[in-house]
Amino acid sequence: MTRRVPAPLLVLAAIVSVQFGGAMAATLIPLVGVFGSVTLRLTIAATVLLVIVRPRLRGRSTTDWLVVAAFGGILAMMNLFFYGALARIPIGVTVTIEFIGPLVLATVLSHRRRDLLAVAGAAVGVALISGIAGTPWAQVDVTGLGLALAAGAAWAGYIIFSARTGARFAQLDGLAIAMTVAAVLVAPAGVITAGSAIWTPDALWRGATIAALSSVLPYSLELIALRRLAAHVFGILLSLEPAVAALAGLLVLDQQLSAPQLLGMVCVVAASGLVMGRRSVPSAPAALAETTNQ
């Protein structure tokens, strides 16, 4: 059935799924905290992937395990930073600022000086989104902005190690193992900080929904789409994520953005489309930049 659906529509469906999963995560954080939310998301997603993928564990080299372990560690940090930012600032702002990570990485890999102008435009966009220019410093949520930037840096690291892991592990084997590593790293703190609240039906169904929307469904859709979609087209579609995140925040969380913030979002989306939408951008970052962080 998915063969009849145009690949761009599959990617758009994956983006919508991820961002609404992120908006759903913002409703889980007040119940079990950041660590508890990340624990539920990673543990459930890892369990589903292990059952579906059944990764091969034998015959792996030491380097294979080091690479996938590093991938899992970055995956854990990326989720913690992202959820930490979600707890403090709107999801549209979080995703837009986080997007600077893969944008800068794509610019560095492109080796084109003019792409620096796009990064500069994105920086202006982030300044508008954060409200730093027109808001007293004491009222700026510096911690939230810092966590979003840290999530972006981790996202760039995820792209790099995702490519390295993909080169060493067949299909989704590496992702399933890395997700398990991330879950093991975060789970102790998540269970301790959330306490009995993490086992309540409300928390569990929200966690399962987030895992499905943010991991299982988009991974499946993208795996199909990327087999018949050019990397530069994928990059253009990817640049729509901040806008979709803002829409999800409005519909699910009633988070409304100001005119300057919307203008800043346009700057980041335009910069991302220019850099990651070019045919000369290396395919690995474009193909791997999508949403495991959310």
Predicted regions and their residues:
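Structural signature of hydrophobic alpha-helical transmembrane segments
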Residues: T27-I44, F82-I100, D141-A154, P201-S215, ...
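Specific alpha-helical transmembrane segments that line the substrate/conduction pathway
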Residues: G36-A46, L75, F82-R113, A151, ...
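Membrane-interface interhelical linkers
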Residues: M1-V16, A46-A70, H111-L117, P136-V140, ...
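Hydrophobic/aromatic residues within transmembrane alpha-helices
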Residues: L28, S37, R41, A85, ...
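Glycine-/small-residue-enriched transmembrane alpha-helix faces in small-molecule transporters
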Residues: M1-G36, A70-G73, M77-F81, V124, ...
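Transmembrane alpha-helices of multi-pass small-molecule transport proteins
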Residues: I29-M77, V104-L105, A154-F161, A176-T193, ...
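Hydrophobic transmembrane alpha-helices of multi-pass small-molecule transport proteins
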Residues: I100, R114-A133, A248-L250, P260-R279
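Helix-helix packing/entry segments at the starts of transmembrane helices
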Residues: L40, V95-I97, F161-A183, S215-L251
